[in-house]
UniProtKB/Swiss-Prot annotation:
It comes from the Bacteria. One of its GO terms (biological process) is lactate metabolic process. SUPFAM superfamilies: NagB/RpiA/CoA transferase-like. InterPro entries: FTHF_cligase-like_sf (IPR024185), LUD_dom (IPR003741), LutC (IPR022823), NagB/RpiA_transferase-like (IPR037171). This is Lactate utilization protein C. Pfam families: LUD_dom. HAMAP family: LutC. Belongs to the LutC/YkgG family. Is involved in L-lactate degradation and allows cells to grow with lactate as the sole carbon source.
Length: 241
């Protein structure tokens, strides 16, 4: 359960705001408004998971991202092919139980190292060294916790073994996406996060919304890829998960 912290000087701060507005501070009778029009819920409304996947695939070329479909059984070979296509290691990954659930542990800990492919699995006890590994890595690999079909965005919940820099510092980023994680858009992701907070569940202090490789553009619409993050990105969708 999420622990409630102590808020200091809240009443004083709110009273200052109320004074500036020229009214008394409201301490009761405040309710969340109900908006008559809520178009955010109608985007891809009623879509099946297959239809959401097609929407995600259609968006990927627009965000300069390759999308590859595979199955849980074929995931290991698919991942090996994608990594090789991007130039191989060094590789950095999260310390995530899903790698074991998807049959990738042997690849990370044995097969690639035996082929002289350097693999670093995030180690919370190593501190800054993890960031150094990520900085030198050619490929970073994580799972997507929620995937937004409309924008082609993967949502990552950072944590003790799930450092932000795994998806940020390597030249290439690979996201493994379970098809079941695909939702229409940001609306559903925000609703899920809000629901977890309402239930008192612990929410990561860092939640990242990543839409393909790093893209930067100036006022003249000159696009530069890779300035603030990976130069390339690939989404591997596991269609039977």
């Amino acid at each position: 359960m999420m622990q409630t912290g102590t808020i200091h000087n809240r009443d004083k701060f709110l009273q200052t705001v109320a004074n500036r507005l020229g009214r008394h501070q409201r301490t009761s009778g405040v309710s969340r408004p109900h908006w008559r029009h809520q178009p955010q819920w109608t985007v891809f409304q009623g879509y099946s998971q297959d239809e959401l996947l097609e929407a995600l695939k259609a968006q990927c070329p627009r965000i300069h991202t390759q999308c590859v479909e595979t199955t849980a059984v074929e995931l290991k070979e698919t991942l090996k092919e994608v990594v090789a296509k991007h130039g191989g290691g060094p590789i950095v990954t999260w310390d995530d139980p899903r790698f074991d659930e998807y049959g990738l542990t042997r690849l990370l800990r044995n097969e690639w190292p035996n082929e002289n492919v350097d693999v670093h699995i995030w180690d919370a006890s190593a501190g800054r060294k993890n960031i150094d590994y990520a900085e030198q890595a050619n490929v970073g690999i994580t799972f997507s916790d929620i995937t937004l079909a409309e924008s082609g965005t993967v949502v990552l919940f950072s944590g003790n073994g799930k450092g932000r820099t795994v998806s940020f510092l390597p030249k290439t980023y690979i996201a493994i996406i379970a098809k079941s994680t695909i939702v229409p858009r940001m609306t559903q992701a925000a609703a899920y996060i809000h629901e977890q907070i309402e239930k008192g569940h612990l929410i990561p202090s860092c939640i990242n919304f990543i839409t393909g490789p790093s893209n930067s553009a100036d006022i003249e619409m000159n696009l530069v890829v890779g300035v603030h993050g990976p130069m390339k990105a690939t989404y591997i969708v596991v269609t039977d998960r």
